[in-house]
Swiss-Prot record:
Segments traversing the membrane: 44-62, 68-88, 100-120, 199-219, 221-241
Disordered: annotated span: 1-20
Motif (Histidine box-1): 89-93
Catalytic activity from the UniProt record: a 1-[(9Z)-octadecenoyl]-2-acyl-glycerolipid + 2 reduced [2Fe-2S]-[ferredoxin] + O2 + 2 H(+) = a 1-[(9Z,12Z)-octadecdienoyl]-2-acyl-glycerolipid + 2 oxidized [2Fe-2S]-[ferredoxin] + 2 H2O
Membrane topology of this protein: Multi-pass membrane protein
Name of the molecule in the record: sn-1 oleoyl-lipid 12-desaturase
Location relative to the cell: Cellular thylakoid membrane
Organism name: Arthrospira platensis
Factors inducing expression: Expression is light and temperature-dependent with a decrease with decreased light conditions or lower temperatures.
Protein purpose: Desaturase involved in fatty acid biosynthesis. Introduces a double bond at carbon 12 of oleoyl groups (18:1) attached to the sn-1 position of the glycerol moiety of membrane glycerolipids.
GO molecular-function terms, A-Z: acyl-CoA (9+3)-desaturase activity
Metabolic or biological pathway: Lipid metabolism; polyunsaturated fatty acid biosynthesis
Chain positions of motif Histidine box-3: 289-293
Motif position, Histidine box-2: 125-129
Length: 351
């Protein structure tokens, strides 16, 4: 799902195309300091402890804050919950621990408060890494082709414009609800894993939600869980959108797609506030992560100078998060789509 429509033309402001023979593994990964791949158990578990404390402080703040401070505490708590996801994200890439079972169980536990099925996300996310910005195969913010948009009914066009436009922050919820609970799409061991993860979070929600409503009421449930959960999904939508969807970065058709280009030119480093990057564990330092998922989050900043030295001309310039940037990103594709449709309509009428 994406707000972007595939563009056939190249923008003059986007990074240079990466040569098709770029030896990504040899030229970049092998030049990295070996220490960036080392998993530090102390750092990994301290991250978990700090994140649990932050979420706990957030919930305490919700309990004691006067009404006019609740929005601030909600944003803090939802951002801290996003940190749970980021640690689980490392677990999904097996960069949290050398033991697969530790990664799986930590991932499941941290995904429980946000009701996210771990294995279905893990499997789908690995596909996103393998086919970043490739039409038909990348499952993160997959765009519509222009002809698909034209052939869709008016209702679907309006829906597309809304949820891939100014309501982008709902995109993560739609992705979560429509993709991650269907274990019938998988086969063999993966089907059993996805079924386990899905039933685990469904069971947890079936117990936790009624219990919260009975003990603290509907407003308490909304105040302590629903609103922080919505903040979490705001960040999920925003992070994942800006990682690979800037006006000058297109999704490519299979015959035009190149893996090295998608990982370098198609990935964006966007800076956020220090407190946000702290609570979300540098999830914005995304280029090193897309070159190799073996780097734990706490080492992601170390190889950045290496990437800039080797592939600097191919990297999209760093940007800073702002509402102006979000407006530019979410408005660009919809505007381009409407211009294209109007132009084609006028051309047809003239003919």
């Amino acid at each position: 799902m994406t707000l972007s429509i595939v563009k056939s033309e190249d923008s003059s402001s986007r990074p240079s195309a990466v040569p098709s023979d770029l030896p990504l593994e040899e030229d970049i990964i092998n030049t990295l300091p070996s220490g960036v791949f080392v998993q530090d158990r102390y750092k990994a578990w301290m991250t978990v402890i700090i994140n649990v404390v932050m979420v706990g402080l957030g919930w305490l703040g919700i309990a004691i804050a006067p009404w006019f401070l609740l929005p601030v505490v909600w944003v803090f708590t939802g951002t801290a919950l996003t940190g749970f996801f980021v640690i689980g994200h490392d677990c999904g890439h097996r960069s949290f621990s050398r033991n697969v079972w530790v990664n799986d169980w930590v991932g499941h536990i941290l995904f429980l408060p946000i009701i996210y099925p771990f294995h279905s996300w893990r499997i789908g996310h690995n596909q996103h890494h393998k086919y970043t910005n490739r039409m038909e195969l990348d499952n993160a913010w997959q765009p519509w082709r222009k002809e698909e948009y034209q052939n869709a009914g008016k209702f679907m066009q309006v829906t597309y414009d809304l949820f891939r436009g100014r309501a982008w922050w709902i995109g993560s919820i739609l992705h979560w609800a429509s993709i991650h609970f269907d274990w019938t799409k998988f086969e063999g061991k993966q089907r059993q894993q996805v079924k386990f993860s899905s039933l685990l979070v469904i069971g947890a929600a079936a117990i936790a939600f009624p219990t919260m409503i009975l003990t603290i009421g509907v407003w308490g449930f909304v105040k302590f869980w629903v609103i922080p959960w919505l903040v979490f999904h705001f960040w999920m939508s925003t992070f994942t959108l800006l990682h690979h969807t800037i006006a000058d970065i297109p999704f490519r058709e299979p015959e035009q797609w190149h893996e090295a280009e998608s990982q370098l030119s198609g990935t964006v480093h966007c800076n956020y506030s220090r407190w946000g990057e702290f609570l979300c564990h540098d999830i914005n330092v995304h280029i090193p992560h897309h070159v190799t998922t073996a780097i734990p989050w706490y080492n992601l900043r170390t190889p950045t100078p290496v990437y800039r030295k080797i592939g600097g001309e191919y990297l999209y310039p760093e940007c800073d998060f702002s509402w102006g940037l979000m407006k530019q990103v979410v408005d660009h594709a919809i505007c381009m789509m409407r211009i294209t449709i109007i132009s084609q309509s006028l051309t047809t009428k003239r003919v």
